[in-house]
UniProtKB/Swiss-Prot annotation:
Belongs to the SMC family. MukB subfamily. It is found in: Cytoplasm, Nucleoid. This is Chromosome partition protein MukB. GO terms for biological process: cell division; chromosome condensation; chromosome segregation; DNA replication. ATP binds at G34, G35, N36, G37, A38, G39, K40, S41. Homodimerization via its hinge domain. Binds to DNA via its C-terminal region. Interacts, and probably forms a ternary complex, with MukE and MukF via its C-terminal region. The complex formation is stimulated by calcium or magnesium. Interacts with tubulin-related protein FtsZ. Plays a central role in chromosome condensation, segregation and cell cycle progression. Functions as a homodimer, which is essential for chromosome partition. Involved in negative DNA supercoiling in vivo, and by this means organize and compact chromosomes. May achieve or facilitate chromosome segregation by condensation DNA from both sides of a centrally located replisome during cell division. It comes from Yersinia pseudotuberculosis serotype O:1b (strain IP 31758). Gene3D superfamilies: 1.10.287.1490, 1.20.58.850, 3.40.1140.10, Immunoglobulin FC, subunit C, MukB, hinge domain. Residues 337-480, 509-605, 780-805, 835-915, 977-1116, 1210-1235 form a coiled coil. Keywords: ATP-binding, Cell cycle, Cell division, Chromosome partition, Coiled coil, Cytoplasm, DNA condensation, DNA-binding, Nucleotide-binding. Its main location: cytoplasm. GO terms for cellular component: cytoplasm; nucleoid.
Amino acid sequence: MIERGKFRSLTLVNWNGFFARTFDLDELVTTLSGGNGAGKSTTMAAFVTALIPDLTLLHFRNTTEAGATSGSRDKGLHGKLRAGVCYSTLDVVNSRHQRVVVGVRLQQVAGRDRKVDIKPFTIQGLPTAIQPTEILTELVAERQARVLSLPELKERVEAMEGVQFKQFNSITDYHSLMFDLGVIPKRLRSSADRSKFYRLIEASLYGGISSAITRSLRDYLLPENSGVRKAFQDMEAALRENRMTLEAIRVTQSDRDLFKHLISEATSYVAADYMRHANERRIHLDSALVLRRDLFSSRKQLVTEQYRHVEMSRELAEQSGAESDLETDYQAASDHLNLVQTAMRQQEKIERYQSDLEELTYRLEEQSEVVSEASEQQADNEARAEAAELEVDELKSQLADYQQALDVQQTRAIQYQQALQALERARALCQLPELTADNAEEWLETFHAKEQEATESLLQLEQKLSVADAAHSQFEQAYQLVVNIAGEVSRSEAWQTARELLRDWPSQQHLAERVQPLRMRLSELEQRLRAQQDAERLLQEFCKRQGNAYQPEELEALQRELESQVEELSLSVSDAGERRMAMRQELEQLKLKIQELTARAPVWLAAQDALSQLSEQSGEALEDSRQVTEYMQQLLERERETTVERDEIAASKRAIEAQIERLSQPSGAEDARLIALAERFGGVLLSEIYDDVTIDDAPYFSALYGPSRHGIVVPDLSLVREHLQGLDDCPEDLYLIEGDPQSFDDSVFAVEEHEKAVVVKIADRQWRYSRYPEVPLFGRAARENRLETLYQERDRLAERYATLSFDVQKTQRTHQAFSRFIGSHLAVAFDADPEAEIRLLNTRRGEIERALNAHEDQNQQQRQQFDQAKEGISALNRLIPLVSLLLDETLADRVEEITEELAEAQEAARYIQQHGVSLTKLEPLLSVLQSDPQQHEQLQESYVLAQNSQRLAKQQAFALTEVVQRRAHFSYTDSAGMLTENSDLNDKLRQRLEQAEAERTRAREQLRQYQSQFTQYSQVLASLKSSYDAKRDMLKELSQELVDIGVPADANAEARARARRDELHAALSTNRSRRNQLEKQLTFCEAEMDSLQKKLRKLERDYHQIREQVVNAKAGWCAVMRMVKDNGVERRLHRRELAYMDGDELRSMSDKALGALRLAVADNEHLRDVLRLSEDPKRPERKIQFYIAVYQHLRERIRQDIIRTDDPVEAIEQMEIELGRLTEELTAREQKLAISSKSVSNIIRKTIHREQNRIRMLNQGLQAVSFGQVKSVRLNVNVREAHATLLDVLSEQQEQHQDLFNSNRLTFSEALAKLYQRLNPQMDMGQRLPQTIGEELLDYRNYLELEVEVYRGADGWLRAESGALSTGEAIGTGMSILVMVVQSWEEESRRLRGKDISPCRLLFLDEAARLDAKSIATLFELCERLEMQLIIAAPENISPEKGTTYKLVRKVFQNHEHVHVVGLRGFANEIPSLPPIAAELQQGG
């Protein structure tokens, strides 16, 4: 027997009070004991979170919150966690003894919403010795640990060999793996399945009878029969599609004639207009080409005239340009003459100002000498006046000193003081610190010698200064002349500059004398140069007309060549006429041949269209009539072969359909009579009992039961005996087996298994040997597998049958087409292509026309060459006499050379004219400039310095003399002598003072006189300088104006300018007469051009009109062609035989088709509107749009499941082939798809009966359950009365309601809903659709009512309601219901899970104190019998004797809260012991 999987342990990491705690779970009951707040609910919440990590469902409320709608904001999970990473894991060992750790990582999310982030994961292959806490935490110290994050956990697990870590982003994937491994009992595919599972866990956790589960017991206990519902839905969908296809076939059959008529008339309507427009476009193109040829020829003629006009206009323009140039030159010559006259007048002014300037220069020099002498006298007078003033002041100071000496002592003291002052003054003045009264006499001699030397030097300088004053005025005059001539030069370079100027003076005079001869030579060369330029212009014009560049020496040879060319051209023109006549005759013959072939082309094109259609249908290249007849014989043979093969496929298909119908019987009965017999005998078909057998076991059981696998299992054979009397409607062999259908097994036979076979001992003397069938049919899975194969084979045969039927019809129609072709087109179909011959002839005609045009062009070109050659000869006659002038290449250089020499001579003449007088004056003064112009000033400065030196020497000598004279004052022995001497000295001083004052007065008077005279001289000098500067500035302005005028101002310039003006006037008159002559010729040429242009404008107008028509037609035609090609209708519309009909015939054909189309589309609004728009003759593309719309309309009417083409024309052909065959097949298919109402009733009843039996088996497990006064619990299953009536009517009275089930407008579901409403008119169905109601009626669960009943005391069986039971009884009853649901889920999921997996069973019960000891013992017994685990949360006063009990105590130590846990094993039959089961891991920092 398969061992059931168990939860080994629950691990909490970093929960509130649990840092790292693992609870080992008992195989039966695990009790969490502790006071309020000890952590029991937290532990259960961790378990539930690991089991169902869905935040939309989790809500951990207190029992006091039961019935509350909101509860705490975080739904009880956020507050149970601590900050950081938290884990809740379940350690599971399944039936395969595989250890799996499933769990979640939880983490609080910061914010006011108190959210929690959950990540589920699994660990597979973890060794048994490793505890979950060792994986989830990491030891930091001896009593400290750290919680690993999820990535760290993944790294640690993946580092272990053979251990797999998997993280889930989807809860569905997480639960899918848990289901496959046997952790949960039911596959949770959706959120609704998770909600059911959570409601079950929640009801278990909080105890009592959950209204959420009791109200939905059908959803919890009864499995959904999705296969039956899907079969009904598929059947209805197939019937709906079948009916829609049949309806489409009927509509298509009715529209087939409309298809033919519409496509035929639309093709005639649009193709006729299409080809008419194509023909008109070709005609317009031909007309446009003819007009273009005429236009081009007229343009060529006009171009010739225009060329002549351009040539004359060019010559006129040249003459006009030359006239303009001559007028400009004439005006320039007149202006030049005026300028020469102005320059002559300007030169006269310059000469007059130069003479005035020379006179002013002389006067200025004289006055400068006078002012210089006055300045010197002024300086002498100022010096004498200053010396007189100093002498008077000194004498006055000496006299005042002597007058103050009133007595001897005072006088001695004064004298002594004066002696000391004189000594100090002498020391300072002589700069002799060592001077004393004793050595003063010696120094006096030295300074007397210095004074004498200074005086002699002064006399020498006075002598030199007098000489320099005489030469100073001449130097200034010569220097001013140099500056006037050469510009600003330094005084030191004046002599050298003057020498150079005088040296260049003779050469400048020589150049000035050559001006007149050079001007005459230049005039002669310029005249020849102008003649050469005129000749070059004529040569350039000649080369331009000839189109080649010729050298002057080549002109004579060219003249001879042009004369010979004229002779040749005159001969070639005469031969052109005969050749033109021959080409025109050939052109007429080609036109006649083309007309004949054009009449044959339509018949041949019609035959080719028919032949191409036959080639497309046959896939053969039919090249002659023999191949056509041979292919007809092949068609007859192919039709016979295909018909035989089709009949064979139809027989095979019927055999497979019969086998499918036999295998599709409900309950696996190959004979429908067995189902009725089973109901009559009250038994069950053996195939129905083994309906769930797997496909792997099907061969064994099929061989085991042999022929009896179609037997009926009855509870008692004796009760069946009476029914066998007179039994006629049954198979030939009917097997009856006695046994309980609910617990039937194969123990009734003695079996020996062999390889791929069994030996069954039916009796002691009777054995049966049966081999495993190659295709087992026992069990639903085997039948479905076989049916799938048969369905595929049937579809293949149906497809092949359809293909063969289509081929037969197609072959028949192809044979008929070949017969029509032979009768109508065989005679002309294989003739040569007339259109190809027409194209060749048209090509030849185009060649001849082009050759004719080329001939005309060549002839015209030769005439032009003839005229051009004659014109060239006349031009050469003018050019040849000028060849020598053209070959003179040095003429321009010589003109340029003479021009440069003349410019130099004129420049020299202007120089001599301007500076000749100054050079004449400068020549005798050249020697004066040799001395440095600055020496006079330096001499004056030396003289002043010498005067100062002499004065200083005198003062020094006077000071020393005074010291020597006062040497006696340094002694004080003789006072009287000193007084006498003092009195004499005083008198002398007074006399000298009087003389000095008189001298001072005379010096002042003389200084005033000289100052007045000097002022007068300076004013005169300033006046002269001002006049000189004004005259000089005016002379510079006049000279600059003369330079700006830019013409020579000599005597012959005016005569030359006047001669040049007269010459240009004569040339201008000659040019004007030639221009008038050209204007007259141009007028005649323009008259001829006007006549040509009028003709050309008419041709252009006609050509542009027809070209505009062609262009507009081309734009529309391009749109039409693009539309035609994009939609693939070119082959239908481009009917070449219509190209040979004229426009009236095509228009008549289109109008007839239009009338028929108006009637055909009268009922179709869209096509009617498109047809109305297409009638616009200016918009041919609208007819194409109508044709496309018709095609699209017909294409939309084609069902692709019926006809294998998108082309309506081909669809019409295929339609006739397919419609009849499809109608027959679909009608038969509808009869096979239809299901009888009795079969539906039997299926639903069988399903209800099976589920009732299953629930009765579940009830047997709850009969011994008792809680308090409740002695037993059971589940009642009843069929609703209204639904039971519906089943009876479906099985017994279906003939009365065939109007519903035989209606093609109602599906089976809708008919079932209508029948239900008819049977229950009092029920309000609301706004629900019949289809929805019918689908609900096909679900057997809606036929059943489920109620939970309890047997309680004297009341007997009562409905289980919380109000009628105590709390403990309600908890126990609810637990019983939950156990039943879990069992139901396990059975329902058995086929989805591996055979070797028995899932874990575990429920919860919080606050179990409401149960008494007996009820708890009942729970223990229930868990033991059902191999179920239970986790109970109980207060401290409960001490169960079985299972495992954990004592939880919440403690606070140093602000750290943790739960102390002690675990105890049960001690009912053992010695009590209190060791802890799991060591407590102290909470880490």
